[in-house]
Amino acid sequence: MNVFQIRDKLKQRLAHLNVDFKFDREEETLRIYRQDNYKGVTIKLNAIVAKYEVQKEKIIDEIVYYVEEAIAQMDDESIEKMTNIQIMPVIRATSFDKKTKEGHRFIIEKHTAETNIYYALDLGKSYRLIDESMLESLGLTEQQVKEMSLFNIRKLKNEYKTDEVKGNIFYFVNSNDGYDASRILNTKFLDDIYQQCEGEMLVAVPHQDVLVIADIRNKTGYDVMAHLTMEFFTKGLVPITSLSFGYEKGHFEPIFILGKNNKQKRDSNVIQRLEANRKRFNNKK
C-alpha cells in the first residue's frame, strides 16, 4: 500500500461527507475540509502507510472515524448550541501547530522541553482544540480554561494495568477516552504511584492514548522502558515523544536512554540547543 492508494481509499470512505480534498504531493498530505466554512484536518499519508503494514484496515477505520468526528464538530454553530461545557487538557509535542489553519492562536501552556499542554472542548466522542477565537463564544478567559481543565483531569478515573519485566514494574494507563496522556498532569495520581516505587520512577507519554509509568529497579529496566516508549510512539495515531521523564515531587526531567543499560539526564544547555536547532529547521520549511 503506497501514499496514493491510501489517499484514494480515504477519499472513497469519506465520500459521503460534504467536504473537498486537497492532495499535496510534495508533503504527502491530504487536507480534508468542509465546503461551507473551509475548516478541516490534514492527514500525513506517509505515516499511515507505515502503520498500514501492521494494522491493515484498523488504521483506516481509526482515521475515518477521527475525520468524521472532527468535520462534524467544525460546524461554526456547534459551540453556541452547547449547554454543558467540558474543558480538558491534552498533551502535544512541542513541534505541534501553534495556530489553526485560519491563523488563530491555540491556547497553550509549556509543560516540559518535549511537551506542551493544549486545551480542548470535550464533544463526547471527540474534542476540539481551543483557540483564542473561541474564548468569547465559550464565555471564558484563558486562565479559566486552564483552571477548569486541570480540575476536570483530576476527576477522571486512573485505572491501569501492571506488568513486571525482569524485576521492574510497569504501569499502563490506556482507557482510550482521549485523555490517557493528559493524566500526566494529575500530580496526586503520580505522587501515589511514586510512594509505591522502590526504584527510580519514570513516566512517558509516547502518544495521546497511553501513559506509561515505570518503577525502575535495575539497569535492565531502562532498556525495557526505551523499547516500550519507542514502540508506542511509532504506533500512535497522535504521537507525542519517545523520551521518558524522571519524576519526583511534581518535577519532570527528560532523559535519554543511551545504548544498553545507560541513561543520561538532559541539562538545560542541551535542551536550549535542541530547541534552537528545531526552530531553525522549522523556519527553513
From Swiss-Prot:
- By what name is this protein known? UPF0354 protein SH1179
- What species is given as this protein's source? Staphylococcus haemolyticus (strain JCSC1435)
Extract the InterPro entries matched here: DUF1444 (IPR010838)
The similarity annotation says: Belongs to the UPF0354 family.
Q: Give the highest taxon in the source lineage.
A: Bacteria
Q: Which residues cross the membrane?
A: none
An example Pfam family from this entry, by short name, is DUF1444
